[in-house]
Amino acid sequence: ALWKDLLKNVGIAAGKAVLNKVTDMVNQ
């Protein structure tokens, strides 16, 4: 279903954002 793909994409995007934020914190 379209909404499932949308939800998955949002979840992946959120996961990447969190990962980037954690990486920035570790690098500082």
Swiss-Prot record:
Recorded superkingdom: Eukaryota
Modified-residue entries (Glutamine amide), positions: Q28
GO cellular component terms given for this protein: extracellular region
Claim: Secreted is one of the keywords in the record: yes
UniProt-annotated location(s): Secreted
Example GO BP: defense response
Tissues in which the UniProt entry reports expression: Expressed by the skin glands.
Main location as per UniProt: secreted
Entry keyword Secreted: yes
Entries under Pfam families matching the protein: DD_K
Keywords, ordered alphabetically: Amidation, Amphibian defense peptide, Antimicrobial, Secreted
Family (UniProt): Belongs to the frog skin active peptide (FSAP) family. Dermaseptin subfamily.
Function: Has antimicrobial activity.
Protein name: Dermaseptin-1
